[in-house]
């Protein structure tokens, strides 16, 4: 009947709304994490620049830096997290 179809559509819309909210939350968290990494990288770049300027009158010295990249995968199905995986890769420049 029409009423059953309407109820089914409402249920599906509510489920999609919940999935949207979860995905929006994940997106917001990832954007915050990206902003944090950008600030860290900018701070690292500023630190390296000031180290190079201050070492101009000294004998040459090695400046080494490293970078850490964290990749996080979150698989959400029907509004539930079904799989998460995190990988950290460190590189020396």
Curated annotation (Swiss-Prot):
Q: Where is this region: Disordered?
A: 47-69
Could you state what the record's PTM comment says about this protein? A disulfide bond is formed between rather than within filaments and promotes the formation of a keratin filament cage around the nucleus. Ubiquitinated by the BCR(KLHL24) E3 ubiquitin ligase complex.
Question: Which positions fall inside the IF rod domain?
Answer: 1-48
Q: Which Gene3D superfamilies match?
A: 1.20.5.170
From the Swiss-Prot or TrEMBL record, state where the protein is found: Cytoplasm; Nucleus
Q: Which UniProt keywords apply?
A: Coiled coil, Cytoplasm, Disulfide bond, Intermediate filament, Keratin, Nucleus, Phosphoprotein, Ubl conjugation
Q: Where is the composition biased (Low complexity)?
A: 49-68
The annotated region (Tail) lies at 45-93
> What biological-process terms (Gene Ontology) are attached?
intermediate filament bundle assembly
A single Gene Ontology CC annotation of this entry is: cytoplasm
Q: Which residues carry this modification: Phosphoserine?
A: 57
Record's function text: The nonhelical tail domain is involved in promoting KRT5-KRT14 filaments to self-organize into large bundles and enhances the mechanical properties involved in resilience of keratin intermediate filaments in vitro.
Miscellaneous information on this protein: There are two types of cytoskeletal and microfibrillar keratin: I (acidic; 40-55 kDa) and II (neutral to basic; 56-70 kDa).
What's the protein here called? Keratin, type I cytoskeletal 14
- Source organism of the structure: Bos taurus (Bovine)
* Gene that this sequence comes from: KRT14
